[in-house]
């Protein structure tokens, strides 16, 4: 594999391995940051007193997004040396990144819409009826 993927050049191997290490660190950072945000969203939608199904949906989407996006970087980092490049590794598992990023983005948008609705629209309608 060394001769086939890297044409026998140690420089190319070192470059891919070093970039793979960056991807593994990136997996940790994304999982940690997005995981904390996911927990915050779960607490926030619970605190807003929303219906249980809506709370479950936001929590599930944000949790899946944070787990999946970190997993994408982790897979890319581990697969890159065997595939010969980090680009090939990212391309081979890009669907994981796309699905998880979309689910996290949907959770973010839904959470902000619910917060704005609860703070401004619902509060404004209470003042009008009082």
Features from the language model and the residues they span:
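Histidine-/acidic- and/or cysteine-rich, low-complexity loops and terminal segments associated
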Residues: 1-15
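Individual transmembrane alpha-helix segments
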Residues: 12-37
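Juxtamembrane loop-transmembrane helix junctions in multi-pass integral membrane proteins
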Residues: 15-22, 49-57, 85-95
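Hydrophobic alpha-helical segments of membrane proteins, primarily the transmembrane helices
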Residues: 25, 60-63, 98-101
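Hydrophobic alpha-helical transmembrane segments
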Residues: 30-43, 105-109
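Membrane-helix exit/interface motif
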Residues: 37-49, 72-83
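Cytoplasmic juxtamembrane regions at transmembrane-helix boundaries
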Residues: 42-62, 123-130
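Alpha-helical transmembrane segments of multi-pass integral membrane proteins
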Residues: 67-129
